[in-house]
Amino acid sequence: MTAAVKFLLIDLNRDEGLPPPLLALNNEFAQELSYLCPEKAAHLVREAAMACRVGEADALLLAFAQDAAYENPNFEWFRGRFERFIYIDRVVVAPAMRGRGLARALYTALFSRAEALNHSQVVCEINLDPPNPASDAFHASLGFEQVGLAVLPRAGKTVRYFSRKIG
């Protein structure tokens, strides 16, 4: 029997933005997440419905409510179709920390926060091209279902849109 592992989720200080180690973690995976400069990262943290980390830079999650001041084609896709939602903008786990349940712990906390804020669903996009099979499997295991598809020529990606009902 495997013992449950607990992680301390730490809310980011909205006045400080992303600490340098988290910014570096994000930018290490810029192809999947998109590159962030310190100013853009600070704006995202201020606007987020949930901005949290595990450890100094073990994992990061940023998610936005539908009324956030956030310009992003994927976020806009959801805003045009759903009334109330939490949009997962980015989640990243440091390579050395993968497979330990950090992403699942972040999502579990997000689902609880979304329910507490009376949101009906949590949404996200997953790259189809370039493919991200690990993300596909992870989101399927959490009950996400595909609700749309888009080609993003400026980003050089094709994405699928997913939703998970809350409550």
Predicted regions and their residues:
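Short amphipathic alpha-helix that is part of the acyltransferase structural core
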Residues: 2-39, 55-58
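Conserved beta-hairpin
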Residues: 48-65
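Short beta-strand micro-motifs in enzyme catalytic cores
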Residues: 50-52, 84, 158-162
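Conserved acyl-donor/pantetheine-binding loop and adjacent beta-alpha core of acyl/acetyltransferases
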Residues: 62-90
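Conserved acetyl-CoA-binding loop-helix of GNAT-fold acetyltransferases
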Residues: 93, 99-112, 141
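Conserved GNAT acetyl-CoA-binding A-motif
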Residues: 114-128
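Conserved active-site alpha-helix within GNAT-family acetyltransferase domains
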Residues: 128-148
